[in-house]
């Protein structure tokens, strides 16, 4: 170690006695590379070795002292935390746990209450919806009944007026159609809801002081179809004796006609025996001659007059 220290002192003496560090030498001028030549730049001259070693030792001692001080502070702080702050922290933690537990319980209770309330509201809505639907159905039924009465009100009013007049005349005058008969342009019509052969239908009408309907105009034709569609219906036209005739004697040749295309054809292909001598109105209103034993609905007609007899 002593030898190394002497070597270091010798190196320092040599550096101080170097001729290039003594200002200007004999016959020469001291050149400073960093000053004399601006184009030459290099690192600054190195510090003495002893100074560098001293700086390193001081830095190490300072770092060691700081670490020891930091360790002491940590130990003291930890000890205080374990003694006082730790207990307070534990208390605060327990308080937070309790508050969270209470919050969870209250929230769960509120959710259950909302769910129960929502279920009851849903039941009420369902019940109200059912009641509303029933009320709508009742209103629709009342509306339909009202429309029905309004539709038949004029007929009912005429019937009441007719009955009043009949009572005032002590039965001597009858100016309205019988019950279940429909009045149209001075005639009374009865529409069947079952079927008969043509001859049986005509006989039924005669028992009512009427006959199978005789169609005299397009207006009457339209009225008949409105009440018979979609059924095939017998009318009072036949050619059983070889020529077409209306049952009330109306002239066939000059009266209204509404035959379907190619009709009458007296077709025999029905394989029922006999010819087609009776007329039925089809659902589209066109006339067709048919086998008289076919079973169709029918319409009776009679004129309305003061005595109620068939005109």
Curated annotation (Swiss-Prot):
One of its GO terms (biological process) is immune response. Expressed exclusively in hepatic parenchymal cells. This is Asialoglycoprotein receptor 2. The gene is ASGR2. Calcium is required for ligand binding. It comes from Homo sapiens (Human). Residues 1-58 are cytoplasmic. PROSITE patterns: C_TYPE_LECTIN_1 (PS00615), C_TYPE_LECTIN_2 (PS50041). A lipid is attached at residue 54 (S-palmitoyl cysteine). The modification Phosphoserine is found at residue 13. It comes from the Eukaryota. Mediates the endocytosis of plasma glycoproteins to which the terminal sialic acid residue on their complex carbohydrate moieties has been removed. The receptor recognizes terminal galactose and N-acetylgalactosamine units. After ligand binding to the receptor, the resulting complex is internalized and transported to a sorting organelle, where receptor and ligand are disassociated. The receptor then returns to the cell membrane surface. Keywords: Calcium, Disulfide bond, Endocytosis, Glycoprotein, Host-virus interaction, Lectin, Lipoprotein, Membrane, Palmitate, Phosphoprotein, Receptor, Signal-anchor, Transmembrane, Transmembrane helix. Its main location: membrane. It holds the Pfam family Lectin_C.
